[in-house]
Amino acid sequence: MFGVLQKPHVLVLGLGESGLAMARWCGLNGCRVRVADTREAPANLVFLQAELTTAQFMGGQFTENLLDDIGLVAISPGLSPLEPNTRALLEAAQARSIPVWGEIELFAQAIGYLEATSGYAPRVLAITGTNGKTTTTALTGRLIERAGKTVGVAGNISPSALDKLSACIASATLPDVWVLELSSFQLEYTFSLAPHAATVLNVTQDHLDWHGSMEAYAAAKARIFGPAEKGCLQVLNRQDPLTMNMARRGTTLVTFGTDLPETPGSYGVLREGGMPWLVLAEPDTEADAEQKPRRRKKDDVAADAVVPVRHKRLMPADALHIRGMHNATNAMAALALCRAIDLPLNALLHGLREYRGEPHRVEWVATIDEVEYFDDSKGTNVGATVAALSGLDKHVVLIAGGEGKGQDFSPLVAPVAQYARAVVLIGKDAGALREALGATGKPLIDAGSLEEAVEKSASLAEAGDVVLLSPACASLDMFRNYVHRAQVFRGAVEELALSRGIMP
């Protein structure tokens, strides 16, 4: 279960969901476990003490003596390697030649062990990206089920990968396919995971406080494809330069985007008669045999020339229940991953039509006086809000603001100028948003609460418009979390409906 290590004494750093899962897993597999957390009494301590009575817990600042008699460090994804206390401990571990793994590395080692000892060889699909990970992961899992395979969906989406694997082993229900949603934090300490196919949906500014730079953030995302010699099929967004830079020569590459695909096996959008269609590029066997190959463009860097293609219509984009072209790209990525493991296309297309989306991700809430209200509370960074504005393709009254995490808000300027009727600002970084969006010429209105923001948005919106909560910011300045923020928004929309004599 632990590679060349034989039931090592494990130091688990951090006792969040992943930390508890790693402690459980290591204890279950015969390891001595020491758990350290900078908090003296983390919430999960009661579960650790109840489930793993032999585990040693040490609270407070990390010190080098935590490493005494340790053979493996298992680090939680919430701990940045740049934080001074954590960095000092990791450097000390390196000096002692103690390996440092994350939860997904433990999962990968376990899958390798199961294959070697019992022949269990599941297909593994992996998904990351700044935005759209959870929707794409959940959708991929649904499509696999629709195609008649058993599937384990885990990782950043919850449950943790190790908890899910433990449950499957205990119940003798190991799945045919694993679908893993992976954050950049999880990938930082993942080394041997070798998915059959993986995607990076997009890379925009986020988590720079954890990684230190965009280059480091993108490099962590690129780890999802595993060791180059394993030949992971890459599914990349051809309209995102940072993801296309991850393409490897000699590796099968499938791309997706909202433009027309130019290489066989890639996905895109064909607009015909005002209707957008999801399409698949196929070799055009009827093309003129004398036609000279064209130089390959940005959607496939693995070869020098392209063959002629025709575009097979798969389904109208409007047939998707999930709204917006950004969700159409998520759907294409999920479809590409499933086709990479040879699942039948017709079953997958039926699954796409049935999927209704995940909560708080451009989720329809109500229509009041011909104005639609959408909850995108999970839009906690600029890239998510840009995608939501562009994807809805309507006049929008945007509710934005919160804890900005030091982001650059300037990428919002163009979509706000194009789509917004007005922006209602809330939260700690409302001033920074106002400064960034001043050049748009759009009305910028302050609100002291989310309830007030809904009232003001309703007065600004016109028939056919959308009121969109897509904050581009974290929620912790005003709310417990993004779910609480969504609940307050939905409650305010319901009150608005009742005040106008409409049953929500």
Curated annotation (Swiss-Prot):
Pathway: Cell wall biogenesis; peptidoglycan biosynthesis. GO terms for cellular component: cytoplasm. InterPro entries: Folylpolyglutamate_synth_CS (IPR018109), Mur-like_cat_sf (IPR036565), Mur_ligase_C (IPR004101), Mur_ligase_C_dom_sf (IPR036615), Mur_ligase_cen (IPR013221), MurD (IPR005762). Keywords: ATP-binding, Cell cycle, Cell division, Cell shape, Cell wall biogenesis/degradation, Cytoplasm, Ligase, Nucleotide-binding, Peptidoglycan synthesis. GO terms for molecular function: ATP binding; tetrahydrofolylpolyglutamate synthase activity; UDP-N-acetylmuramoylalanine-D-glutamate ligase activity. The keyword DNA-binding does not apply. Pfam families: Mur_ligase_C (PF02875), Mur_ligase_M (PF08245), MurD-like_N (PF21799). PANTHER family: UDP-N-ACETYLMURAMOYLALANINE--D-GLUTAMATE LIGASE. Belongs to the MurCDEF family. This is UDP-N-acetylmuramoylalanine--D-glutamate ligase. The gene is murD.
